[in-house]
Design a protein with these regions (language model features):
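A cytosolic-side transmembrane-helix exit/cap motif
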Residues: 259-260, 309-316, 418-422, 439-445, ...
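Hydrophobic transmembrane alpha-helices
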Residues: 58, 62, 266-272, 425
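Primarily membrane-embedded glycan-assembly and transfer machineries that use lipid-linked glycans
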Residues: 3, 15-258, 282-416, 500, ...
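Transmembrane-embedded, aromatic-rich helix segments that form part
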Residues: 260-263, 271-282, 289-293, 420-422
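Aromatic-enriched
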Residues: 15, 35-41, 426-507, 511
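Active-/binding-site microenvironments in catalytic and ligand-binding cores
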Residues: 10
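Short amphipathic alpha-helix initiation/capping segments at coil-to-helix junctions
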Residues: 395-399, 414-422, 432, 436-443
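Active-site proximal loops enriched in glycine and acidic residues that flank catalytic Cys/His/Asp
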Residues: 410, 423-425
């Protein structure tokens, strides 16, 4: 009886490691909850108090649910635990700062790039909000650039480039009421929850020691600028990637309805459509059917609600501008070389070479490169699909992320904060499945720094144009190289996960 009671007490005991992980996880989550309260109309101080109370109530339950394999890590891998603690605290602090700026834009000093006037005054969400307002008011051509010349508070209104169907999400927000700032906060909460939830869901689906290691690496990815800067800006790129990956996991789990609902909307960002090629090549006809069905449903819903004007404006005005390159022609103007320098687009390499004085670089060359790259990523999707049956879960999700990143690089303009998100997430998966030897630790550290390199425009000493080009292109090369390696490497299958779990390495032990 005594032995049984002692065993039961040991079974329910929560280790210090799990308490710390749970506490820091809630520290990352609580500021987002506080922003949600502000979006709903609560005062910031009240919202923060509610978030703190809720967080403290959740910590014990979360700590009990965390993997017991993490117990005693502070004794067996003290240095790794100390490094993890520093990164996790920094991630929580930086995330809290961004959340404060999202709740109250007057506190620019807490934003991700507080020193850069451009990032402090830029909001990608402003384009979605303005376009939704224009569509609901019945404007004939919501894509007319003259509609986006003003400001929303301190934020310069961005130009809207998306398909009309995308308006469904921001239009729901504007229909529910609230001003731009409250809807900006709500959009941040929605996208943060979606991205964070997708990251955790992938770790759980991969499972095993690799999944646990991936979960421990999440604070490092969350700390990276491609995540927090882009969440602050409100660009849909992150949500589109998260929705696409969740859709593919749903298809693998035999839930085509959910997967179709997610991917059917994500494809309105265009580049996730590459996964449709992958699904066709793997003969997942139910997944293809549900994706097409939901895309059609969203299209009908937007047409019925907002009318024909947005669609007609896109077909007759915006689509020709995109196809001809006119929509991005400003990138060829003199004086925009700093913008060209942060462009991670593959066709945008022509712009970089032109800015460096290389002759023969023209919009025609840029367009030719874009179509060659399009054919290349189509071929890579089919190549990956033909080997999908041999892949482990880790290899599958890594391949999906790599394909999404490569497809996104087809656009004429991919700012570094957008273009590096999928690769930094991919880095997490590669690191989680890698045996940690000194040379590999160095390589992973260099890759992490390169994939975190979002270059500011001002507010601090910056390298000259050639230096910016070199830094940006190095980061771009690491990102593209990582994605290509993941797609082209030979699949090891489920045995790879078992092999990684059996490796006598720090990474294995910390899993």
């Amino acid at each position: 009886m005594q032995v049984t009671l002692s065993h039961d007490r040991a079974a329910v005991r929560v280790s210090p490691e799990r308490w710390v992980v749970a506490g820091l996880a809630i520290a990352l989550l609580a500021p987002v909850v506080a922003v949600a309260g502000v979006a709903l109309g609560l005062r910031l101080d009240v919202s923060v108090l509610v978030a703190v109370v809720l967080g403290m109530a959740v910590v014990p339950s979360l700590a009990r649910r965390l993997p017991r394999e993490w117990d005693e890590l502070r004794r067996t891998h003290a240095a790794w635990c100390a490094a993890w603690l520093v990164v996790a605290v920094l991630a929580a602090l930086r995330s809290a700062g961004v959340a404060w700026f999202m709740a109250d834009p007057q506190h620019a000093q807490s934003s991700a790039f507080w020193f850069d006037p451009f990032y402090v005054g830029h909001s990608c969400y402003s384009a979605y909000w303005q376009a939704a307002e224009l569509a609901r008011s019945g404007v004939e051509n919501l894509y007319d650039t003259s509609h986006y010349a003003g400001f929303a508070g301190r934020f310069k209104i961005d130009e809207f480039f998306y398909l009309p169907q995308f308006l469904l999400l921001p239009a729901v927000g504007t229909a529910l009421g609230g001003d731009f700032l409250s809807l900006r906060a709500a959009w941040f909460v929605l996208e943060t929850a979606l991205v964070g939830g997708a990251m955790v869901a992938l770790c759980r689906w991969v499972g095993g020691a690799v999944g646990r290691r991936a979960a421990l690496l999440l604070p490092a990815v969350w700390l990276a600028s491609p995540v927090l800067v882009t969440l602050q800006l409100g660009n849909f790129q992150l949500a589109a990637i998260a929705m696409s990956v969740l859709a593919m996991v749903s298809f693998e789990r035999g839930r085509p309805l959910l997967g179709g609902a997610l991917l059917g909307f994500a494809v309105f960002k265009l580049f996730p459509g590459l996964l449709g090629i992958y699904l066709i090549a793997t003969r997942q006809w139910r997944a293809v059917g549900w994706t097409l069905a939901f895309s059609a449903l969203y299209t009908v819903a937007v047409y019925a609600w907002l009318g024909a004007a947005p669609f007609e404006a896109f077909v007759h005005y915006q689509a020709p501008r995109i196809l001809s390159g006119e929509a991005w022609s400003f990138l060829w103007l003199d004086g925009l070389e700093p913008v060209v320098a942060i462009n991670d687009s593959v066709p945008g390499l022509a712009l970089k070479l032109d800015a460096l004085g290389v002759g023969g670089m023209t919009p025609a060359i840029e367009k030719a490169v874009s179509w060659v790259w399009t054919l290349a990523v189509f071929a890579l999707a089919i190549f990956a699909a033909r080997r999908a049956a041999k892949m482990s879960r880790l290899e599958l999700v890594s391949t999906w992320l790599a394909l999404l990143a490569l497809a996104a690089y087809r656009s004429p303009f991919v700012p570094d904060h957008n273009g590096l998100f999928a690769p930094i997430w991919l880095w997490l998966l590669v690191a989680a499945g890698t045996r940690l030897q000194p040379s590999r630790v160095v390589a992973l550290a260099i890759a992490y720094l390169a994939l975190s390199a979002v270059l500011p425009f001002g507010g601090m000493p910056l390298p000259e144009l050639h230096g910016r080009m070199a830094l940006s292109t190095f980061s771009q090369a690491i990102a593209i190289g990582l994605c290509l390696w993941v797609v082209l490497r030979r699949p090891l299958g489920e045995a790879s996960g078992a092999r990684a779990s059996a490796m006598p390495s720090p990474a294995m032990s910390m899993g």
